[in-house]
Amino acid sequence: MSRGLGDVYKRQVGEGPFVAEKAADGEWNDKLRKAGNEFGAATGRPRRVGPFDAVASRYGLQCQNAGDIALTKLDVLSSFEKIPVITGYRVNGKLITDFPTNVLLDAAKPEVEMLDGWNCDISYCRNWNDLPENAKKYIERIEELIGHSIYLVSTGAKRDEYLLKE
């Protein structure tokens, strides 16, 4: 098994089904887009963004044959009071937790769990105990939802702004 990589939120460039975009209101997505600087490098166009999607992430990790993972961009969520997390999709009234075909993906509506944010700078955090309690709970919930351990968390944009999870 290899080590996997994932972000705490989802983004997409261009058209096509994107369930995460439907999980939060436009204001939340706009704030996320600004916090993560999610604009095209050449065009400046806003990228499509949405909260963490456990269904898509599990599928991606399966495709990577990943064991434990590095979770990036946790700092981007530091200004949010509440953070939505997609736990499943509802398609034609039925809850699904496995990534569907594109035909079903178009019709999918996200099932969302709201987690408490931490609303403070975490870029100084270099070990697990430095993180705010709600940030730890967020990471632990992600681990539960994806069925993989998180071994590293990036806490800022700089190369040395990360921690190894104990």
Residue ranges and their predicted role:
Residues 1-9:
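Single conserved hydrophobic/aromatic residue that forms the stacking wall/gate
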Residues 10-11, 61-65, 143-150:
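Structural signal for hydrophobic packing residues in well-ordered secondary-structure cores
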Residues 10-33:
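An anion-binding catalytic pocket shared by soluble metabolic enzymes
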Residues 12, 31-41, 84, 114-122:
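Short acidic (Asp/Glu) and glycine-rich catalytic loops that position anionic groups and cofactors
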Residues 13-20, 81-85, 162-166:
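Short acidic, glycine/serine/threonine-rich loops at helix termini
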Residues 17, 33-102:
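C-terminal catalytic subdomain
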Residues 27-43, 138-144:
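Short, hydrophobic/aliphatic alpha-helical segments
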Residues 84, 94-164:
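Internal helix-turn-beta structural module
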